[in-house]
C-alpha cells in the first residue's frame, strides 16, 4: 500500500515486452525482464503478451504474461524487502553467479544440503581468490554495511522481520524470496 509506480518500462510495445541484446542472455537480464513484466501487468491491470528477450546466437528468454493480481502481490513483496533494506543492509546481490544456479533450477530451497552447496558456491564469487582478485566483498560499501561480518553467516533470527525463519541463512532465504518466483515462471510452474 502507498506505493506509486511512475516512469516507463523499456521495450514495452503496448502489448508485450520485446528486447534484443548483443550479448548472451544472462540470468540477471532474466530477473530484470521478470520485474519489467510485473510492472507492466500491475500498471495496466491486464495480462500482457509474452516478454521476449533474444540474445546473441539466438538464445532467448520467453516469459509468459503474468496475471495482474500476481504481479501486484510479487511487487508488494519486493517493495517490502526494499523497505526492510532501508533499515538494515540485506545480504543479497543480483550477480549472475548468484542467479544462474536458481534460474537453472539447480537449487532446491527445501533441501538443506542443496542450499548449503549453493551458499558455498556463491561465497566463492563474493570473496577474492588468486584467479578472481576483485570481488563484491571488497567493495567499501559492502565492508561498511556489514562491519566486516560475512554476509553468508547472518541468520534470519538476527532481524525481527525474518525471525520466524529461525536459524536459516538470511542470504539463502532472500535468494529464494527474490529469485524463486522467476525460476518458477521460467520452468512453467507459475
PLM region spans:
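Structural signature of nuclease core domains in nucleic-acid processing machines
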Residues: 1-190
Amino acid at each position: 500500500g502507498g506505493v506509486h509506480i511512475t516512469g516507463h518500462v523499456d521495450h514495452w510495445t503496448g502489448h508485450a515486452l520485446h528486447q534484443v541484446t548483443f550479448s548472451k542472455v544472462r540470468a540477471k537480464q532474466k530477473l530484470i525482464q521478470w520485474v519489467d513484466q510485473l510492472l507492466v501487468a500491475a500498471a495496466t491491470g491486464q495480462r500482457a503478451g509474452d516478454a521476449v528477450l533474444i540474445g546473441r546466437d539466438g538464445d532467448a528468454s520467453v516469459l509468459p504474461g503474468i496475471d495482474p493480481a500476481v504481479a501486484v502481490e510479487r511487487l508488494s513483496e519486493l517493495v517490502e524487502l526494499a523497505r526492510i533494506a532501508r533499515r538494515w543492509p540485506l545480504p543479497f546481490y543480483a550477480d549472475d553467479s548468484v542467479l544462474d544456479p536458481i534460474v537453472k533450477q539447480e537449487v532446491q530451497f527445501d533441501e538443506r544440503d542443496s542450499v548449503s552447496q549453493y551458499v558455498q558456491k556463491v561465497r566463492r564469487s563474493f570473496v577474492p581468490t588468486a584467479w578472481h582478485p576483485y570481488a563484491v566483498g571488497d567493495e567499501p560499501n559492502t565492508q561498511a554495511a556489514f562491519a566486516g561480518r560475512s554476509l553468508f553467516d547472518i541468520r534470519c533470527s538476527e532481524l525481527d522481520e525474518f525471525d520466524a525463519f529461525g536459524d536459516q541463512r538470511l542470504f539463502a532465504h532472500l535468494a529464494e524470496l527474490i529469485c524463486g518466483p522467476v525460476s518458477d515462471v521460467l520452468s512453467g510452474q507459475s
